[in-house]
Regions:
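Non-catalytic carbohydrate-binding regions of carbohydrate-active enzymes
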Residues: 14-113, 117-123
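Single conserved hydrophobic/aromatic residue that forms the stacking wall/gate
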Residues: 1-9
Length: 123
């Protein structure tokens, strides 16, 4: 059975090897987390699921990381919030420039951005 990003969130299947790979994958990226490593031969900066940053993926990974590596989770959260603040509610973004692509005023970007910034406000 293959495991998708949903499993990362629902079952918290993150282990140290996965976290290490995520850190390595993101270490040279200004905007986290690209859907394909920028140095991979299949990387395409503007093409669906071939390289862009997706806020929904960052959100799922952040939620899965919170109980495993809070420092890295907070880095993803902070960079995701900053990306949306700077570039807007686009569907997806360049991992190199942060430029938004796809639909503008995209609802899942807006909803997940709100979830991230409002988290812990009522605690």
């Amino acid at each position: 059975r293959s495991r998708g990003l949903g499993d990362v969130y629902k079952r918290q299947v993150l282990n140290n090897k996965i976290i290490k790979n995520l850190k390595k994958h993101s270490s040279k990226e200004k905007y986290l987390l690209s859907s394909v490593k920028p140095n991979h031969q299949k990387f395409e900066e503007k093409r669906y699921w071939r390289g862009p940053v997706w806020i929904n993926c960052n959100w799922i990974i952040y939620k899965g990381l919170k109980n495993k590596n809070i420092k890295f989770a907070q880095q993803i959260k902070r960079k995701t919030i900053n990306l949306v603040k700077q570039k807007g509610f686009n569907e997806y973004f360049s991992c190199k420039t942060g430029k938004g692509f796809g639909a503008t005023n995209f609802s899942w970007t807006a909803a997940l951005f709100l979830d991230l910034i409002l988290e812990n406000k009522n605690d």
